[in-house]
């Protein structure tokens, strides 16, 4: 409830959860490129962050994870508020590098995001791209930028179609 404090509607609660996730966690591109997706346990990630603990994927409370972990954290917090939320996976276009004509891996399942049911419909939420916080496992460098955008919080169907391919809900 602390994370969603001041939010009165489910939609506002989801927005606060999105902001919390984007502000407080770091994307681990090395884990992604080496397919080390073991950092997805949302309960450990949240607990370690809130208590400043170190673990396999956290140092002094700074937690690094991949898209699967970002989405799992968002999903766990949304469900804790009683808001139906589900995992979705598929492929996210490597923008701005590629477009659908130049993308090599369209059929590769390599990205996770979420959908939450609010106001009578499922909304698209990709908490990974709400931040550019980065962790470089090779160098140990942490780059903090905080929340950088709301582009993929309740994104329109048209917007999603330009960047994501659904492979499973």
Where in the sequence are the language-model features?
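Active-site nucleophilic cysteine motif
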Residues: 10-17, 21, 63-81
